[in-house]
């Protein structure tokens, strides 16, 4: 009977040891992820407070960078897991893309390369200017900033769907960013803006199902006699102009 007690004791000790090691590993991963996110967030903060906008495009980009800086700081403060800390880093990286956009809009050196954002590699990018009529108003996409296209997006997923990197006359993705869901009419605008554009080599169905350029590597469902059954809908929706965030005062110049 005593050997059963020994086995139980050994098992309990082993379990406690493994749990302690797991807790140490989890704590170490969290600490490393927090440190990594903090470096990126501090880098973003330095740029937010050093740059001053010179035109509408840079003002919008700096406002978005400031919003991402505040959001990343809040996420980092609340991060109790490595995954949440990595999310804070992603938010800060988004902010750095907006900093890069602001510098580009002011004809400054955009600075060093920035790590790719989640979903950015499948979203594509605007590589030619295009203006379409949507719900009685013109909507423009362009590869470069201008007074007509002051709203930048770095490329990536919004509410599960890919949005190409580029400059736009209005932030047509922002309602989905705020609400976490897309209006059905967005597919109509996506088709009009990007159909046939080389930099966005995927169709509306790939936009709706969130696969983007990744769909190019997937087998066609028709080859297997399958009907994907997507219905884009016809809700015209609307996006309400090009309002950005009010970031407060930006002061000074400074390098990247």
Walk through the language-model features, giving the residues of each.
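N-terminal signal-anchor transmembrane alpha helix of single-pass membrane proteins
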Residues: 1-23
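Low-complexity, glycine/proline/serine-enriched intrinsically disordered segments
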Residues: 17-34, 93, 101-256
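Amphipathic, heptad-repeat alpha-helical segments
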Residues: 20-64
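Extracytoplasmic/periplasmic/luminal assembly and interaction segments
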Residues: 59-79
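Short, charged, amphipathic alpha-helical segments
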Residues: 59-66, 85-93
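Amphipathic alpha-helical coiled-coil segments
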Residues: 72-87, 97-109
